[in-house]
Curated annotation (Swiss-Prot):
Pfam families: Ribosomal_L11, Ribosomal_L11_N. Coiled coil: none annotated. Part of the ribosomal stalk of the 50S ribosomal subunit. Interacts with L10 and the large rRNA to form the base of the stalk. L10 forms an elongated spine to which L12 dimers bind in a sequential fashion forming a multimeric L10(L12)X complex. This is Large ribosomal subunit protein uL11. The keyword Ribonucleoprotein applies. One of its GO terms (cellular component) is cytosolic large ribosomal subunit. HAMAP family: Ribosomal_uL11. GO terms for molecular function: large ribosomal subunit rRNA binding; structural constituent of ribosome. Belongs to the universal ribosomal protein uL11 family. The keyword Transmembrane helix does not apply. Signal peptide: none annotated.
Length: 142
């Protein structure tokens, strides 16, 4: 069995699906760890092609031989809520000004999508987490 490679860096980025390019923020973040930037961009774009338009967080593990692996996460709850509510951005003062409404069904659907990345035991707990995110963005849950 090959010896286990040593991880020397962990990079977390949020990039639009299928749109990774060497420009900031991707280039500088990978460059300082000595990763082949174009190789990552091609691999990321190929892996996220089906989810174009969404922002997909990625966690990149960089090894001492400058190779890397990456794990894709689910889109941020805030982005999914904005899309469901049909508004461009959340409220500047969320507890005073409400910008939109979403139904519990939409919240549960987002919770289903996010379940693997949330620290929740069941869908109801995950839905409460998503509802809390909505509340802090000035989106009412009904």
């Amino acid at each position: 069995m090959a010896p286990k490679k040593k991880v020397v860096g962990l990079i977390k980025l949020q990039i639009k699906a299928g749109e990774a390019n060497p420009a900031p923020p991707v280039g500088p973040a990978l460059g300082q760890h000595g990763v082949n930037i174009m190789e990552f961009c091609k691999a990321y774009n190929a892996a996220t092609e089906s989810q174009r338009g969404n922002v997909i967080p990625v966690e990149i593990s960089v090894y001492e031989d400058r190779s890397f692996t990456f794990a894709l996460k689910t889109p941020p709850a805030a982005k999914l809520l904005l899309k469901a509510a049909g508004v461009p951005k959340g409220s500047g003062e969320p507890h005073k000004t409400k910008v939109a409404k979403v139904s519990w069904d939409q919240v549960r659907e987002i919770a289903e999508t996010k379940k693997e990345d949330l620290n929740a035991n069941d869908i109801d707990a995950a839905a409460k987490i998503i509802a809390g995110t909505a509340r802090s963005m000035g989106i009412t849950v009904e």
